Amino acid sequence: GSQFPAFSTWTEVRLGELMSPTSKSSLAPGIKPRVHVRTVGCPKNVVDSELMMGAFGAKDYDVVGEADDADVLVVNTCGFIGMAREASVQAILELAKVKEEKENARLVVTGCLSQRFSDELATSLPEVDLFVGSGSATQIPEFVGELPEEPDPALREPVLRVGKAGTLYDPDTPRTSTGVGYSTYVKVAEGCSQKC
């Protein structure tokens, strides 16, 4: 058996207190935008989520543990294991409900599910603002910043930013660790063996 936990359902990452963000906000002056990241899948997705949070922190976002407190809602999905795909869709739908109750909130779907099925997801999940492939985790804050400020829900279509799958990151890339104590995951490969 593996020493890593089985990721059969999504795991919510709650790290708001760990961030010390540092760029400009599209909200009222003096108010930092807030991001909530929910991770579904394997330890590789955990690493990608940590890198996303580091990228958001570098763009002056606060990472928050509660979806209700966020302006940007991100689901980092799994697209390979059946149960994790179902959990990914469940997480997307849960955060879509949160988005409906908030003015100008954004919903972003990234990870393997988005990489593999972005066209189908964009058709079936119009409440999602942005689909990002698995190779662009650290660019998500930039992509969110390019979305229209106040989109007309009746006219907008989801934006797809899906390119080359998978990326191994430079060790100096900003990262917010979700590990407990002195442990963390190290991503040494890209892809999925579907063995979990």
Stretch-by-stretch model annotation:
Residues 4-195:
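Proteins enriched for Cys/Gly/acidic motifs involved in redox and nucleic-acid/cofactor modification
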